[in-house]
């Protein structure tokens, strides 16, 4: 959400009040904001008296954040890196870590970044602006790979039909623009009057997650946060769709001592908890916030409190992401 402050635009992140309450006390605390974005959480943390190291892999976010660094120097440090590297950019243990997963409002609102089909732009979606773009994926990956991407990362039930349409169309003309791809999907799947969700939404989600390796980045970031937090420190994670939230929920459940087996990970002996939940389940936006910011509708906040137990060894299999991890390694 964007609010105006003295005539200037200022980003207000989702679930801000429960995030600040859940990470308190913040005065004098050392906090890592692993997903700086437009700086909404970082600014609020600084205003609450915290010392913040903010990370973002997007060079545009880093450039835009320089005035905030100047304003709050020396209490703010801004670093261009993935949040999975957060335990490598700060030496001391910290009091809190906040992660706001997925694409930022700033990225969605800039058509030239190619994250959204609400405005036409190049089919890009790269947060770090390096590596494969969404256009590269759509125009060059095998049809079976596209089906997997749409089915697993987008939970798209029409994945096969959409992938076959893409393969047929790209032989004639490549997909280079966001609205071109969205339009072709809408023509294929159809859209009834009053449908709230555009038929291309899940495909765009899947492409963005794949291009930026978001689920693997999240799993690595959770373990990194566990390593860097001091006893009593708090890890807050805001997620926006079921894939992300299942990973976060599984992580906190496992770290709390609930270590039931799965088809990916055999049942293991119980071990001392490295986290315990601040509250049961996840917090969602209030009706008041939803009226101001409809984007908060799918947001869910989970917070864990770090114990004195040593961090466990990172094991990606506990998330049940074996299929996704193996598939993504073939990019």
From Swiss-Prot:
<comment type="similarity">
    <text>Belongs to the methyltransferase superfamily. RsmH family.</text>
</comment>
<keyword id="KW-0963">Cytoplasm</keyword>
<comment type="function">
    <text>Specifically methylates the N4 position of cytidine in position 1402 (C1402) of 16S rRNA.</text>
</comment>
<dbReference type="GO" id="GO:0070475">
    <property type="term" value="P:rRNA base methylation"/>
</dbReference>
<protein>
    <recommendedName>
        <fullName>Ribosomal RNA small subunit methyltransferase H</fullName>
        <ecNumber>2.1.1.199</ecNumber>
    </recommendedName>
</protein>
<feature type="binding site">
    <location>
        <position position="56"/>
    </location>
    <ligand>
        <name>S-adenosyl-L-methionine</name>
    </ligand>
</feature>
<dbReference type="GO" id="GO:0071424">
    <property type="term" value="F:rRNA (cytosine-N4-)-methyltransferase activity"/>
</dbReference>
<dbReference type="InterPro" id="IPR023397">
    <property type="entry name" value="SAM-dep_MeTrfase_MraW_recog"/>
</dbReference>
<keyword id="KW-0808">Transferase</keyword>
<feature type="binding site">
    <location>
        <position position="107"/>
    </location>
    <ligand>
        <name>S-adenosyl-L-methionine</name>
    </ligand>
</feature>
<dbReference type="Pfam" id="PF01795">
    <property type="entry name" value="Methyltransf_5"/>
</dbReference>
<feature type="binding site">
    <location>
        <position position="83"/>
    </location>
    <ligand>
        <name>S-adenosyl-L-methionine</name>
    </ligand>
</feature>
<dbReference type="InterPro" id="IPR029063">
    <property type="entry name" value="SAM-dependent_MTases_sf"/>
</dbReference>
<feature type="binding site">
    <location>
        <begin position="39"/>
        <end position="41"/>
    </location>
    <ligand>
        <name>S-adenosyl-L-methionine</name>
    </ligand>
</feature>
<dbReference type="GO" id="GO:0005737">
    <property type="term" value="C:cytoplasm"/>
</dbReference>
<dbReference type="InterPro" id="IPR002903">
    <property type="entry name" value="RsmH"/>
</dbReference>
<feature type="binding site">
    <location>
        <position position="100"/>
    </location>
    <ligand>
        <name>S-adenosyl-L-methionine</name>
    </ligand>
</feature>
<keyword id="KW-0489">Methyltransferase</keyword>
<keyword id="KW-0698">rRNA processing</keyword>
<keyword id="KW-0949">S-adenosyl-L-methionine</keyword>
């Amino acid at each position: 959400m964007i609010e105006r402050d003295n005539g200037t635009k200022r980003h207000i992140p989702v679930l801000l009040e429960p995030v600040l309450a859940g990470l308190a006390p913040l005065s004098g605390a050392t906090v890592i904001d692993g997903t700086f974005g437009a700086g909404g959480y970082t600014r609020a943390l600084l205003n609450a008296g915290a010392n913040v190291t903010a990370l973002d892999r997007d060079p545009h976010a880093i450039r835009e954040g320089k005035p905030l660094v100047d304003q709050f120097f020396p209490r703010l440090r801004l670093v261009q890196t993935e949040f999975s590297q957060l335990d490598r950019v700060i030496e001391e243990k910290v009091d809190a870590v906040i992660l706001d997963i997925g694409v930022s409002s700033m990225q969605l609102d800039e058509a030239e970044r190619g994250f959204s089909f609400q405005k036409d732009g190049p089919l890009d979606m790269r947060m770090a602006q390096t590596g494969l773009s969404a256009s590269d994926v759509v125009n060059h990956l095998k049809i079976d790979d596209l089906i997997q991407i749409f089915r697993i990362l987008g939970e798209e039930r029409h994945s096969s039909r959409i992938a076959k349409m893409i393969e047929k169309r790209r032989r004639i003309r490549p997909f280079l623009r966001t609205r071109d791809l969205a339009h072709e999907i809408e023509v294929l799947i159809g859209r009834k009057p009053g449908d709230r969700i555009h038929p291309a939404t899940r495909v765009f989600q899947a492409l963005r997650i794949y291009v930026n390796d978001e689920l693997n980045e999240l799993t690595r970031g959770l373990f990194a946060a566990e390593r860097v937090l001091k006893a009593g420190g708090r890890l807050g994670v805001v997620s926006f769709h079921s894939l992300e939230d299942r990973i976060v929920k599984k992580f906190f459940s496992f770290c709390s001592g609930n270590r039931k087996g799965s088809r990916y990970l055999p049942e293991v002996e119980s071990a001392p908890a490295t986290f315990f939940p601040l509250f049961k389940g996840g917090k969602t936006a209030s009706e008041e916030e939803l009226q101001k910011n409809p984007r908060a509708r799918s947001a869910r906040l989970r917070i864990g409190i770090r114990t004195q137990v040593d961090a466990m060894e990172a094991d990606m299999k506990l998330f049940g992401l074996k299929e996704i991890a193996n598939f993504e390694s073939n990019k």
